[in-house]
């Protein structure tokens, strides 16, 4: 009877792990599991070993290991049974105002632990989403309760954190992961999950993720579930990103066809494949850098493309911006012909 009861308990746990998103299933559990930023990790490890952990400010692009690093530190500092009472993890973008500081953070930081020596840990993810007033209130809380609480702020943009908070923390920048570091970890996941992946599929994953491990794993999982095979084409289709052949066609139409034909063809392709003009613009921008255009032509194109990207970001009509992009390339064509 006891054996069958144990089996019943194990089955839901196994199912729960199996159903986890891969970003959580393969999240590093210790500092040694992390694949990058060894200089930062060794410094933090030294702080922990010497029991001198300062307030931390971890910043950098998404998916580079900031949250995983501090959670691994917390697991090293506290046993499982005391984790809940010693660590407060909050996402500042859920509640960005001053109430989050005066409420849960203040009450957690101000209460001392009876049974355990050492400090509590407050992890504030997406701290750059906090309002100015909330950040000023947090500064005062940090000053007041440094004796028994350590704060770790995590953000993407350091410039959005007030100088008074920055000066009270030890800052570490987490840069994008290199392909050399990402590929072995992705291969490990592929092996564990028995994913059918081609070489060009792996390259496409690394290219589209741009050093963001979380994005790479999400694309890998969704492509595998949607298509059963991960190739360059399925990866690009799953993310709605234009293929190289699509970009080649778009450029050919813009430079060699008249305006009306180019506009019609590109609109049909966008509708057929569900492409966003922003993604097309990003790929064309890379093409402009690769091709040996005369300087005046390149400057003209990049200026026009920068204007179009800005207008797209503030929510203007995509059809008008597509017309503007085609017009910019047709003017470029005339400039090249005139200079020849």
From Swiss-Prot:
The modification N-acetylmethionine is found at residue 1. It is found in: Nucleus. GO terms for molecular function: ATP binding; ATP hydrolysis activity; DNA binding; enzyme binding. Keywords: Acetylation, ATP-binding, DNA replication, Nucleotide-binding, Nucleus. GO terms for biological process: DNA repair; DNA replication; DNA-templated DNA replication; positive regulation of DNA-directed DNA polymerase activity. SUPFAM superfamilies: P-loop containing nucleoside triphosphate hydrolases, post-AAA+ oligomerization domain-like. ATP binds at residues 60-67. InterPro entries: AAA+_ATPase (IPR003593), ATPase_AAA_core (IPR003959), DNA_pol3_clamp-load_cplx_C (IPR008921), DNA_Rep/Repair_Clamp_Loader (IPR050238), P-loop_NTPase (IPR027417), Rep_factorC_C (IPR013748), RFC_lid (IPR047854). GO terms for cellular component: Ctf18 RFC-like complex; DNA replication factor C complex; nucleoplasm; nucleus. Subunit of the RFC complex, an heteropentameric complex consisting of a large subunit RFC1 and four small subunits RFC2, RFC3, RFC4 and RFC5; the RFC complex interacts with PCNA. Forms an heterotetrameric complex with RFC2, RFC3 and RFC4; this complex has ATPase activity but is not stimulated by PCNA. The heterotetramer of subunits RFC2, RFC3, RFC4 and RFC5 interacts with RAD17. NCBIfam families: PRK00440.1. Belongs to the activator 1 small subunits family. Subunit of the replication factor C (RFC) complex which acts during elongation of primed DNA templates by DNA polymerases delta and epsilon, and is necessary for ATP-dependent loading of proliferating cell nuclear antigen (PCNA) onto primed DNA. This is Replication factor C subunit 5. It comes from Homo sapiens. The lineage of its organism: Eukaryota, Metazoa, Chordata, Craniata, Vertebrata.
